Amino acid sequence: GKSSVLECILGIKKPDSGEISILGLNPFTQRKQIFEKTGVQFQEAHYQDKITVEELCETTASLYRNPADYPELLRRFGIKDKLKSAVSELSGGQRQRLFIVLALIPDPEVVFLDELTTGLDVKARREVWKILEELKNKGLTIFLTSHFMDEVEVLCDQICILKKGKAVFYGTVSEAIRQSPYEKLEDAYLWFAGEEGETNEDF
């Protein structure tokens, strides 16, 4: 559900019904303009085994008119020393941080992050949160999909909870808790999603 919504917003998939607008643009008729203004990090990204971090960043930067300073982004995300390394040689956490850097290279107005801290340890997750909070405070809009409620509480001003592909809640974290019979967002999420009492592998 979450990734499909993201793909519809970006014009990769057509929705069954309704209309979509991002930054005042239609993702199906104005994809080029949207491409220049957004950055995307999908949950699963695959690249050539032998391509290096530097080559991948250079290739990505070449697609945009005014790309961000990717060496600085790599430094901030703690992987600048991997510049000459093949992407296939990176650990899962390093690869995930690289994918976030690639999403930020367009110097976007909106960045889409799909399960951005999957595979990161606790320390690395918090470092990524800190950087994203700084970017958010500078005016970057972050569209985040996540199963980690601690991450949602730290990074999100507004949240949308999906149940079987349908939005069942939209509002702030405090509103979600207030409208549920629980005091924690994780419990409120399970209640809205109809997963109370079920085993959820993502928690």
Indicate residue ranges for each PLM-predicted region:
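Helix-to-loop junction immediately C-terminal to a conserved catalytic motif
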Residues: L10
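Conserved ABC transporter NBD signature motif
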Residues: G18-N26, Q33-I34
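Conserved ABC ATPase "signature" region
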Residues: E58, S62, P67-K82
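Conserved ABC ATPase signature
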Residues: A86-L90
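Catalytic Walker B motif of ABC-type/P-loop ATPase nucleotide-binding domains
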Residues: V111-D114
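ABC ATPase "signature
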Residues: Y170-G171
